[in-house]
């Protein structure tokens, strides 16, 4: 039996999704990974301009479940149990999804691979990166109050997390958001259409 907390949390997140796209026979799950400030949310927003996908942005979803997030391991564990449950339920309904989260550990990504494999969903993996100088400027602008989305991460968080990045062991796209992202967007749109 599933944890009632997970189901309750996933329901709260579902209520905030708004209008859902039309279901498809074989939905796609696009998992976007990368350190804070590398441009994951920007990349996801550009992708969503071209694909009618639901974006599940972990930073925004965290703030739905926790009004004053602490980013503790316990909080993150609860958040991602709810996100994984939500992904599973939406894929079962034929909803195409983009998961926008750091997704730095292969063990955590394995859970997503298993969900996609079990539900026969197409899985597309994307590693987003940018040079440390570009990331520093983006995070500095974020800390100075420039509108940068839902993330609270700063340069210190980036520095701490960069040592936890694990290689993606499956085929994936790599995109440097300090350069033109159009070629990778084009490839992903084509892959979704196949």
Residues covered by each model-derived region:
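Extreme N-terminal, non-catalytic leader segments
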Residues: 1-27
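Hydrophobic anchor at the beta1->P-loop junction of P-loop NTPases
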Residues: 32
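The conserved Walker
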Residues: 36
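Conserved glycine(s) of the Walker
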Residues: 39
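Conserved substrate/cofactor phosphate-moiety recognition/catalytic segment
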Residues: 42-93
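Glycine-rich phosphate-binding loop used to anchor ATP phosphates in small-molecule kinases
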Residues: 77-119, 123
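Conserved phosphate-donor/acceptor-positioning beta-strand/loop module used by diverse small-molecule
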Residues: 119-139
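Small-molecule kinase domains that catalyze NTP-dependent phosphoryl transfer to phosphate-bearing small molecules
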Residues: 145-187, 194
């Amino acid at each position: 039996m599933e944890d009632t907390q997970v189901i309750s949390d996933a329901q709260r997140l579902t209520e905030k999704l708004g209008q859902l796209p039309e279901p498809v026979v074989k939905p796609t799950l696009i998992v976007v990974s990368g350190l804070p400030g590398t441009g994951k949310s920007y990349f996801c927003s550009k992708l969503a301009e071209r694909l009618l996908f639901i974006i599940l942005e972990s930073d925004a979803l965290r703030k739905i479940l926790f009004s004053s997030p602490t980013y503790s391991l316990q909080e993150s564990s609860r958040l991602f149990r709810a996100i994984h449950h939500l992904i599973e339920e939406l894929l079962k309904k034929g909803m195409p999804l983009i998961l926008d989260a750091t997704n730095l550990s292969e063990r955590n990504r394995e859970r997503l691979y298993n969900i996609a494999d079990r539900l026969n969903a197409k899985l597309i993996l994307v590693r987003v990166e940018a040079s440390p100088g570009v990331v520093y400027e983006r995070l500095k602008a974020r800390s100075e109050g420039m509108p940068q989305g839902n993330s609270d991460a700063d340069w210190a968080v980036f520095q701490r997390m960069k040592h936890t990045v694990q290689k993606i062991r499956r085929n994936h796209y790599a995109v440097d958001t300090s350069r033109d992202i159009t070629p990778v967007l084009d490839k992903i749109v084509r892959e979704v259409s196949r």
